[in-house]
Amino acid sequence: TLASLTLMLSVGVNAQQSQQFGDYTVHYNALNSSLISNDVAKAYGIRRSDSRALINISVLKNTENVLPTAVKATVTASARNLTGQTRKIEMREVTEGDDAIYYIGELSVRNMETFDFSVMVTPEGQSKPFNVKFRQQFYTE
């Protein structure tokens, strides 16, 4: 289930992080896809490997006195390693009912490779994108 995906994407050394943009919170993380269970990987078409990274983005709209709600968004992402090589990451939407919307993408990584991620997020109904930037180092076995 998606709850399993959510749990797996927020564990380990790659703790979930977020940035606030007005009424919206963008949650993001990246981890080795080998940390995802076989069942979850199969259900969502994720290739499990120490040399594959998974990036996960979700967008929540915050409303006073109400729990945050997941919203659809246009999400584009790229990753640049420390030698300056940039890779576009193909993001795809994963939904479960109206309660959970995630955007996931994959890229190949090498041991101790560090990436600077740049993610452009435009929530549905908004015209200005939010720019989320973060750095992540990956370890392979």
Question: What is each of the regions a protein language model found here?
Answer:
Residues 55-99:
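Mid-chain, structured segments of secreted extracytoplasmic proteins
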Residues 16-54:
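Beta-strand-rich domain onsets/edges
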Residues 123-131:
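Short acidic/polar inter-strand loop motif in beta-rich domains
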Residues 9-15:
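Sec/Tat signal peptide C-region and signal peptidase I cleavage site
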Residues 92-118:
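Short, solvent-exposed, Trp/other aromatic-anchored flexible loops in extracytoplasmic proteins
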Residues 135-141:
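Short beta-strand edge segments in extracellular beta-sheet folds
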